[in-house]
A protein has these predicted regions:
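Hydrophobic/basic alpha-helical segments
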Residues: 1-203
């Protein structure tokens, strides 16, 4: 079933959605390669990639952001194909053994996984700052208040016992916020300022 651009299956597994969007993105990337074969300005490639390819790979990612290595690599493969092409057009030496994160940095891009994490955290920030109004989601945010001083300084209490629950949006983003110790930034910074802060934390 497809609802608002996201493919759902009865077991709430988003592998089908990821396969669909990667397939369509690779097709669009192939189209871009054909129509830009005489272009030389890397900025033009970035504009087309961001507008026609990457947006497909990030639409509603808060819902389907994968945790499995296979799905993460499947998505990153699209950007790797783009980087290989833009390296060739920019006369930058490309070889298969080059570090992917290093190549992303060379062209001022972040990995798709990093961008999905940023999108998750930005949505949580909007939720806590009441930019997004959702009583149900705000009710899922539980603060951890220990009865005595502990070494564990995590702010959010994450309720999840099964893997499917852990992979859903709220447990996933609260766990990430705990890991990065972002509570003060989440509740005290407005979205634009918070986005600048959190973007610097990811490759």
């Amino acid at each position: 079933m497809k609802d608002l651009g996201v493919y759902f299956t009865p077991n709430l597994n988003f592998n089908l959605h990821i396969k669909k969007i990667t397939s369509k993105s690779l097709q669009m990337l192939g189209f871009i390669k054909r129509v830009t074969r005489h272009f030389t300005d890397p900025k033009t490639f970035h504009v087309l990639y961001n507008a026609l390819v990457r947006c497909r790979l990030e639409f509603c990612s808060q819902i389907w952001n994968p945790s499995s290595v296979v799905s993460i690599k499947r998505l990153e493969r699209v950007q790797k194909q783009y980087l290989k092409y833009v390296s060739f057009k920019s006369r930058v030496v490309y070889y298969d053994q080059i570090n992917y994160e290093e190549l992303c940095g060379r062209f001022n891009l972040k990995t798709l996984q990093s961008r999905r994490n940023i999108a998750d955290l930005l949505f949580l920030n909007k939720l806590l700052c009441n930019v997004v109004h959702s009583p149900y989601l705000i009710g899922e945010v539980c603060l951890r208040i220990p009865r005595r001083i502990l070494r564990d300084k995590t702010t959010f209490y994450v309720r999840s016992r099964i893997q499917l629950r852990k992979d859903s949006f709220m447990p996933r983003v609260l766990t990430l916020a705990n890991k990065l110790k972002l509570y003060d930034d989440l509740v005290m910074r407005q979205p634009l300022e918070f986005k600048r802060v959190v973007t610097d934390l990811f490759i």
